[in-house]
């Protein structure tokens, strides 16, 4: 079986592997806490090709992002379906897709906490959400709601221009009572997003997130926050810095979000600054790759065998082979950094897999 794309090996299955009988004896030990929990906004990305008349009928400004009321969103979906204009329907929430990617790549269980429509028609967008989600994701704890989940329409015109239309539906109606404590007892991490903190003042989602965070801290489960977009951070930097300090173990961000949070344009310096509030930082920098920053015990730091890299922190990757440890668990904590370049230089073009999701996580 050949592997598509650029690879170092010609075949997916190595032809020089050890005796399979010996491999069975030397099985990899199972993790005691393999489950990842995520609190997410259940939303479906719906991509369709439309003409300009379609946009005018629904009063959509071409090339812009707009919010749709529910009745108009329903009518729009009906017409797209009846005229067979939809090209893709995939889960679109950051957390849901991060869990999906984890379950696929790690072949391990994850639990999604969110909402789902009580009545689902075969072939509908909610149906597609469930169909295109990994079977290793546990959806049994989803809170049922009377109404639609979120829908994000990407309407592509004949000239390639993209128009976005969003209807949040009931995606922010997750209540704190729907966060079960028992799933945290054998969990490896709780993953949340900055998107969950915005919405209407009456939405219960922020309270649900806070309950999940409190349960995670109670059971000593690391809390992972992906910043999602710089627009949520800008203007509220101080609040987010305090939130990270009080609640978060690991933060994932890109260079724009890092600059909004820390004021540092350089992703390495932004990651270094974020260590004031958290124990581990992941900062993606587009085609440049991924920077990581964390803490380790001074006595246990391990030097790299790779070339030392220049940067605003000289030879920053010197101890990149060190194991990351929580700062509070180190007697003499020292900062360690690493950089991962895109594999074989990265792809020639970026293609969508299953929608939004933090691949770095």
Where in the sequence are the language-model features?
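Short, small-residue alpha-helix embedded
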Residues: 259-260, 350-361
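Gly/Ala-rich phosphate-binding loop of Rossmann-like dinucleotide-binding domains
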Residues: 103-104
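Active-site gating loops and adjacent loop-to-helix segments of metal-dependent hydrolytic enzymes
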Residues: 56-82
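Catalytic-loop motifs flanking and including active-site residues across diverse enzymes
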Residues: 91-98, 356-361
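The feature captures the short pre-catalytic strand/loop hairpin that immediately precedes
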Residues: 75-80, 337-348, 358
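Ribokinase/PfkB-type carbohydrate-kinase core domain
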Residues: 1-65, 86-90, 94, 107-109, ...
């Amino acid at each position: 079986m050949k592997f598509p794309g650029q690879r170092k090996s010609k075949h997916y299955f190595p032809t020089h592997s050890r005796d399979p009988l010996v491999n069975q004896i030397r099985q990899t030990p199972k993790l005691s806490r393999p489950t990842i929990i995520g609190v997410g906004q259940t939303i479906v990305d719906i991509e369709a090709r439309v003409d300009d008349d379609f946009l005018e009928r629904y009063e959509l400004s071409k090339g812009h992002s707009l919010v749709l009321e529910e009745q108009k969103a329903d009518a729009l979906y009906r017409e797209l379906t009846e005229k067979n204009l939809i090209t893709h329907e995939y889960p679109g929430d950051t957390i849901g897709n991060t869990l999906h990617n984890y379950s696929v790549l790690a072949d391990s269980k994850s639990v999604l906490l969110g909402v789902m429509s009580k009545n689902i028609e075969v072939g509908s967008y909610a149906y597609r959400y469930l169909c295109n989600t990994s079977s290793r994701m546990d959806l049994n704890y989803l809170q049922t709601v009377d109404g639609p989940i979120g829908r994000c329409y990407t309407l592509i015109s004949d000239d390639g221009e993209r128009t976005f239309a969003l209807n949040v539906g009931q995606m922010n109606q997750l209540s704190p009572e729907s966060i079960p404590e028992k799933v945290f007892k054998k969990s490896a991490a709780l993953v949340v997003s900055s998107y969950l903190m915005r919405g209407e003042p009456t939405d219960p989602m922020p309270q649900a997130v806070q309950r999940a965070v409190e349960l995670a801290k109670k059971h000593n489960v690391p809390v992972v926050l992906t910043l999602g977009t710089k627009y949520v951070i800008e203007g509220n930097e101080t609040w987010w810095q305090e939130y990270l300090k009080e609640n978060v173990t690991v933060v994932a961000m890109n260079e724009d979000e890092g600059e909004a949070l820390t004021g540092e344009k350089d992703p390495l310096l932004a990651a270094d600054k974020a260590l004031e509030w958290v124990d581990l930082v992941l900062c993606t920098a587009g085609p440049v790759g991924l920077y990581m920053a964390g803490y380790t015990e001074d006595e246990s730091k391990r030097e790299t065998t790779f070339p030392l890299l220049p940067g605003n922190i000289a030879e920053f990757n010197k101890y990149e082979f060190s194991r990351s440890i929580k700062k509070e668990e180190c007697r003499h904590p020292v900062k360690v950094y690493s950089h991962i370049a895109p594999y074989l230089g990265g792809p020639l073009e970026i293609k969508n897999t299953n929608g939004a999701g933090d691949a770095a996580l």
